[in-house]
Amino acid sequence: MKTLLLTLVVVTIMCLDLGYTTKCYKTGERIISETCPPGQDLCYMKTWCDVFCGSRGRVVELGCTATCPTVKPHEQITCCSTDNCNPHPKMKQR
């Protein structure tokens, strides 16, 4: 009986989310939604123009951050704090 109770306690602890973690979209080879590392509770979207801006549009970078990045000249940055609040501008909203 003690073994059964101990097993149930262990399974319950493993299934619980013991700390809230933010999920953000991240760019890489493809756009994915990932859980942010501890301490990075904000999502961001940074856009800027490169040499192909006229034909391809602005470059978009998505990810997690602890603090909203400092804006450099010719960049636009938005930060938010809810799950997947930083979708790529070309993604369809659900």
Swiss-Prot record:
Keywords: Acetylcholine receptor inhibiting toxin, Disulfide bond, Ion channel impairing toxin, Neurotoxin, Postsynaptic neurotoxin, Secreted, Signal, Toxin. It is found in: Secreted. Pfam families: Toxin_cobra-type (PF21947). Its main location: secreted. Disulfide bonds join 24-43, 36-64, 49-53, 68-79, 80-85. One of its GO terms (cellular component) is extracellular region. One of its GO terms (molecular function) is ion channel regulator activity. Residues 1-21 form the signal peptide. Expressed by the venom gland. PROSITE patterns: SNAKE_TOXIN. It comes from the Eukaryota. Belongs to the three-finger toxin family. Long-chain subfamily. Type II alpha-neurotoxin sub-subfamily. Binds with high affinity to muscular (alpha-1/CHRNA1) and neuronal (alpha-7/CHRNA7) nicotinic acetylcholine receptor (nAChR) and inhibits acetylcholine from binding to the receptor, thereby impairing neuromuscular and neuronal transmission. This is Long neurotoxin LNTX8. It comes from Ophiophagus hannah.
